[in-house]
Amino acid sequence: MSVVGAINPVPIAPTTRRRVGDSLDVISERPSNSSDYCNTINQPIVGSTDLDGGDATGQDSSPSSESSASSTGSHYHHDHYHRFYSHPVIRYLLLRKFWIPFYGGASTVVIGQGFRSGRNVGRRILGLLMLLVVASVFLRVYLMGGVRVVDHARLKEFVVVRTLRDDWSMAQREVAENQASSQPMRVLEKLPIPEIWQKPESGNYRQCVTRPKNYTRLQRQTNGYLVVHANGGLNQMRTGICDMVAVAKIMNATLVLPLLDHESFWTDPSTFKDIFDWRNFMNVLKHDVDIVEYLPPQYAAMKPLLKAPVSWSKASYYRSEMLPLLKRHKVLKFTLTDSRLANNGLPPSIQRLRCRANYQALLYTKEIEDLGKILVNRLRNNTEPYIALHLRYEKDMLAFTGCNHNLTTEEAEELRIMRYSVKHWKEKEIDSRERRIQGGCPMSPREAAIFLKAMGYPSSTTVYIVAGEIYGSESMDAFRAEYPNVFSHSTLATEEELEPFSQYQNRLAALDYIVALESDVFVYTYDGNMAKAVQGHRKFEGFRKSINPDRLNFVRLIDHFDEGIISWEEFSSEVKRLNRDRIGAAYGRLPAALPRLEENFYANPQPDCICNKSHPEQLRKQSSLRTDSKSWKKSALR
């Protein structure tokens, strides 16, 4: 007893269960200290080895009342509550402190006082159970509101996880969908595209360059090897290579990967493989012509026969003039490739082959294609449209045409000297003013800016300049004053991105080609080789808007506007009227009296490679032309 009392001053009766309950009462009245509870409850009860052997009451314990511990009241409680107190749960509750986590100490006091008296213990236990039920309901609602309640059910050997919140959301969504299904569907209207960005109506025209389904290429021995030296700038070489593919087909020749021009104005040392995806070129055309990387060893050491084909020649020329030479010498080299095949009057299969070569086989290298796509995405920031302006106001073009409008005297003299230094340029003395009035000069940057403004393009329009270095010290100032959002490959790409291409003008021209092809509007101020190639490609891709300004009438109008003869409103209205039908719409290319006067095949591949599917007679006409063309195929085999 003295040992126990030294540890804890709370008096503990040695014999009866009632003393145990009284001890708990005394403990519950002390300050809430977890260490005290542990020390008190965990002490051994002196004089009692069996907790089930005594009885207890709810009376307060005191030393003077120890003699009444064995009164009849004790036996009464022992008789009626023996089973209750002997239950393991109750024994645990009597020896432990109760705690409800969400109401703290207040709940502890309430429950503790519930056991202070042995009277009506059943009611208090019932109340405790009811409290637990209420608490469980509260937790259920609380968890449904924010905590995931996961139920696992085994269904066909799969574990299904259900979340109450998700089930509730699904139910609400199902109700909403059922209600919405009974109402008319609301369709979001697309904002109309402004007219200045709309492409022309393409009608029912479609690409028609595929081979017939029953096409089988005859396996026959080659008549020889054709080596071609493409001349000129990138786009002149590009179209020339496509013509040489067709010529190789006509003569049943094996085409060697073309050689590119390294001696023209640009002096670009790039090879065919540096600019074009040569594997794709060979793979796309493998069912049409045989293409090899190099001459076979037995022919590599031979000196080929050099020939320059006649410009705008028909298939009959190559069959009658060139094919015998090829068969005799086995290796034939063409030193020129530009415009060496007629625009019209060729078999439909040959015309379609030219288109397959240009639009499907001649892809640029992956490095060029990837950077081109990056530049397009930067121009289309937030899906904004942009104009690609082929401003052919470059030194070589101005020297060739003799145009020096708006240039200084020193700059005009520099152009004249350059024109005389190029031997194959036949025209030397040119009246610049007269050439401009005739519409033979490219627009100056100022004229191009005024033209775009008159056509309705706002100053906020993004403009990409498709050209090399613009000639003239102050030529671009007037353009930037009207259109400040102007870019080129040198300002749009980083130095690191341009580093592999910066020293190669043809590779930079390939980048410009991609950006121009993908533009929302393409405007070209002069009918150069790039303008022809890009506008034809855009027609082939679905008649994307390509504006060809009426330069002849524009020169007259802008001079009148500068002189104050007409107002801006009159000037703008007339510019729009004159160029209303010059936006790249569908129309068929027609032959002319002289090949030089014809529209270039690659500037407008319709109707040969773009067909009207709603007109079966056009397809029947092409079928008859294929039948008529069998004769030249037989001659090529002989």
From Swiss-Prot:
A Gene Ontology cellular-component term: membrane
Enzyme Commission number: 2.4.1.-
Enzymatic class: transferase
Region of interest called Disordered, as start-end residue ranges on this chain: 49-74, 613-638
Keyword Transmembrane helix: yes
Keyword list, A-Z: Carbohydrate metabolism, Fucose metabolism, Glycoprotein, Glycosyltransferase, Membrane, Signal-anchor, Transferase, Transmembrane, Transmembrane helix
Binding site for substrate: 390-392
Protein's membrane topology: Single-pass type II membrane protein
Pfam short name (any one): O-FucT
GO molecular function: glycosyltransferase activity
Biased composition (Low complexity): 61-74
GO BP: fucose metabolic process
Pathway(s): Glycan metabolism
Glycosylation sites: 214, 252, 381, 406, 612
Transmembrane segments: 125-145
The keyword Transmembrane is assigned to this record: yes
Compartments in which it is found: Membrane
Location, primary (coarse class): membrane
Family note: Belongs to the glycosyltransferase GT106 family.
Name of this chain's protein: O-fucosyltransferase 28
Natural source organism: Arabidopsis thaliana (Mouse-ear cress)
Gene it is expressed from: OFUT28
